[in-house]
Swiss-Prot record:
It is found in: Secreted. This is Alpha-conotoxin MII. Expressed by the venom duct. It comes from Conus magus. The cysteine framework is I (CC-C-C). Alpha4/7 pattern. Transmembrane segments: none annotated. Disulfide bonds join C50-C56, C51-C64. Residues 52-54 are annotated as: Ser-Xaa-Pro motif, crucial for potent interaction with nAChR.
């Protein structure tokens, strides 16, 4: 294989890898953003002591967890 042919193959591999990686990056960003929002809510409630308060825990059981 000549140098020009090897360079062409290299560029095709890089291009194919880049095109394949973009859709998966966009999909994971949405999931990560949703997980980060929920994590920030849990941290906020925990810092305020809400999860240790029975009444508040019942109102926000989706954020504090179902166990009590």
């Amino acid at each position: 294989m000549g140098m020009r042919m090897m360079f062409t193959v290299f560029l095709l591999v890089v291009l194919a890898t880049t095109v394949v990686s973009f859709p998966s990056d966009r999909a994971s960003d949405g999931r990560n953003a949703a997980a980060n929002d929920k994590a920030s809510d849990v941290i906020t409630l925990a810092l305020k002591g809400c999860c240790s308060n029975p009444v508040c825990h019942l109102e926000h059981s989706n954020l504090c967890g179902r166990r009590r």
